[in-house]
A protein has these predicted regions:
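Aspartyl protease active-site motif detector
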Residues: 92-142, 184, 202, 218-222, ...
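Beta-strand elements of modular eukaryotic interaction domains
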Residues: 81-85, 93-96, 104-106, 173-175, ...
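Beta-strand-rich binding-surface signature
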Residues: 90-94, 103-107, 114, 164-166, ...
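Disordered propeptide/prodomain
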Residues: 2-106, 114-178, 198, 230-231, ...
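Charged, amphipathic alpha-helical segments
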Residues: 161-169, 223-228, 239, 347-359
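Glycine-rich flap/beta-hairpin and adjacent strands of clan AA aspartyl proteases
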Residues: 168-281, 371, 377-431
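Typically disulfide-stabilized, N-glycosylated extracellular/lumenal ectodomains of secreted
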Residues: 263-264, 292-301, 305-307, 401
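Extended C-terminal subregions enriched in glycine
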Residues: 345-378
C-alpha cells in the first residue's frame, strides 16, 4: 500500500525549483507506465494468483478487441464514437493537472485520442479515489471558445460560447464536458517533473458506465489532432516510444518522448505506419508470418496483400493483450505451429484454443515466429508467443478475430518507437527492465 500511496504524493517544495517547461524541439523525457496488474497499481489484488490475473487480462483483451469497431447510432447531444472499450486500458500513467498541480492516475492508450479527467461541478460522475479536479482552484485553467481551432466537428459549441464534447466508448461508457486548456505536469524518471502549458483536454462534468474508482481518466496517445501526442508534436519532434516489461516483473514499463524516444543502433527494424480517415489507430502493413521455416502470406477475404494498399492491414495497439488475426489466416498460422511441435495439444483456456503441457524440453520445441512488416521484421521469442495460463500449462498467445491487432504480449521486451514526422514504427529487442 505504501507504493500505491506514493503515486499520489503532492510536491511540497517550490515548483520553480523542481520543474522545467518544455521549450525546445530537442527536449526529451521519460515517464513510468504502470501495468494495471502490477504491485505498483491500485488495481493489484495480492489475494489473486498470477494465473487469475493473467486470465482477467485476456478477458479484457477479448472485450476490447470485440468493441474496437462497434457502430453506434448518433445520439443527442452529438457524440464522438470511440472505438476502444473504456475499462480495458492495460497501462496507467501519472499526470498532474492545473496550477497548483493535482495528481491523477489515468489509462494511457494508443487507441484513444481525447485526454480527459472528471471535473467540478460534477453533474453525473463515477466515484474515484482521488479528489475531483476543480477548475476554479487552478490559475492556468481556460475554457476553449467555440471559435478556437480545436473546436471543429465532431466537437460542438455549447452554452457560454464554450467548446463541448460528448464521447461514447464501444462498451457504452461515456464522458461529457468542456474542451479546455490547462497546464500538465509529468513526473519523469529523471526525478525532475516537466510542465507543459496549454494542453487541450476534456474537463468532464458527466461520466458513467464501466469506469471505476482506480482510474481517473484517459491519456490519449492515438493518431488524431486531439491526442496529447499530436499536441506535443513540435515539442517532441513527433517522437514517442514505449518499452514494456514482462508481466511477472515488478519494474515499471516506460514511455518516452522527444530525444529520449529515438530508437537507434544495432538490430533496429522500421516499418511505415498508416492512418485512416476518422480513425485513431496506427496501422502497419503485415506481408507475411514465418513459423519455423514455413512462410504464410497475409491474404484474407478483407486484405489481398497488395503492397500498393495505403491504409495498412493490422493495428498496433498497446492496450490489447493478445495478437488477433483474421480467422482464416489465424487457422493457417495455428496449423503450421502445431505441425512444428511434436507434443500433443491439451484442452484450451477461454479464447486461447491451443495449449500444451510445459514438460521438460517443450520450450525448445517452440518454433521462432517472425512477423514480416513492410521494410522490417520482428522475431518473436517464446516469451512473446506462449503464456503460462496455469502451472505447467502454456497457451499460444494469439487468437482469431475480425480485426487484425498486434497486441502487447508480442511487443514485450521490445523498444517500440513512433515517428510522426517520418510516419514509421521502429522495433528493437530490448531488456525493458534495464531501459
Amino acid at each position: 500500500m505504501e507504493l500505491i500511496s506514493s503515486l499520489f504524493l503532492c510536491f511540497t517544495i517550490s515548483l520553480s525549483l523542481l520543474t522545467f517547461p518544455i521549450q525546445s524541439r530537442s527536449s526529451g523525457f521519460s515517464i513510468n507506465l504502470i501495468h494495471r496488474d502490477s504491485p505498483l497499481s491500485p488495481y493489484y489484488n495480492s489475494s489473486m494468483s498470477y494465473y487469475e490475473i493473467l486470465r482477467n487480462s485476456i478477458r479484457r483483451s477479448m472485450t476490447r478487441s470485440s468493441h474496437m469497431f462497434t457502430p453506434k447510432l448518433a445520439s443527442s447531444p452529438p457524440t464522438i464514437q470511440s472505438p476502444l472499450t473504456a475499462v480495458t486500458g492495460e497501462y496507467l500513467m501519472k499526470i498532474s493537472v492545473g496550477t497548483p498541480p493535482l495528481d491523477f492516475l489515468a489509462a494511457a492508450d494508443t487507441g484513444s485520442d481525447l485526454t480527459w479527467i472528471q471535473c467540478k461541478p460534477c453533474i453525473e460522475c463515477y466515484q474515484q479515489n482521488t479528489p475531483i479536479f476543480d477548475p476554479k482552484r487552478s490559475s492556468t485553467y481556460r475554457n476553449q471558445p467555440c471559435q478556437s481551432k480545436v473546436c471543429q466537428k465532431p466537437l460542438s459549441c455549447g452554452d457560454k460560447n464554450f467548446c463541448n464534447y460528448a464521447f461514447t466508448y464501444g462498451d457504452g461508457s461515456y464522458t461529457e464536458g468542456d474542451i479546455s486548456l490547462e497546464s500538465f505536469t509529468f513526473e519523469t524518471t529523471s526525478g525532475k517533473p516537466v510542465v507543459v502549458p496549454n494542453i487541450s483536454f476534456g474537463c468532464g462534468h458527466k461520466a458513467g458506465g464501466n469506469f471505476d474508482k482506480f482510474t481517473d481518466g484517459i491519456v490519449g496517445l492515438g493518431n488524431s489532432d486531439l491526442s496529447i501526442i499530436n499536441q506535443l508534436r513540435n515539442t517532441i519532434n513527433g517522437k514517442f516510444s514505449y518499452c514494456m516489461v514482462p508481466s511477472k516483473s515488478n519494474v515499471p514499463s516506460k514511455i518516452s518522448f522527444g530525444s529520449n524516444a529515438i530508437v537507434s543502433g544495432y538490430g533496429v527494424q522500421r516499418t511505415p505506419f498508416f492512418t485512416r480517415d476518422q480513425q485513431l489507430y496506427y496501422y502497419l502493413f503485415l506481408e507475411s508470418v514465418t513459423i519455423g521455416e514455413a512462410n504464410i502470406k497475409f491474404v484474407t477475404e478483407t486484405y489481398s496483400n497488395n503492397a500498393n494498399d495505403k491504409d495498412g492491414n493490422i493495428i498496433i495497439d498497446s492496450g490489447t493483450t493478445l495478437t488477433y488475426l483474421p480467422s482464416e489466416f489465424y487457422q493457417l498460422v495455428e496449423d503450421e505451429f502445431k505441425r512444428s511441435i511434436s507434443s500433443t495439444p491439451v484442452e484450451g483456456e477461454d479464447e486461447l484454443t491451443l495449449c500444451y503441457k510445459n514438460e521438460e524440453g517443450f520450450e525448445k520445441e517452440v518454433p521462432t515466429i517472425t512477423f514480416h512488416f513492410t521494410g522490417g521484421n520482428l522475431e518473436l521469442s517464446v516469451l512473446n508467443t506462449m503464456l503460462e495460463i496455469e502451472d505447467g500449462k502454456l497457451c499460444f498467445a494469439m487468437a482469431p478475430g475480425g480485426t487484425a491487432i498486434f497486441g502487447n504480449v508480442q511487443q514485450t521486451s521490445c523498444l517500440v518507437g513512433y515517428d510522426l514526422e517520418a510516419k514509421t514504427v521502429s522495433f528493437k529487442k530490448t531488456d525493458c527492465t534495464k531501459y
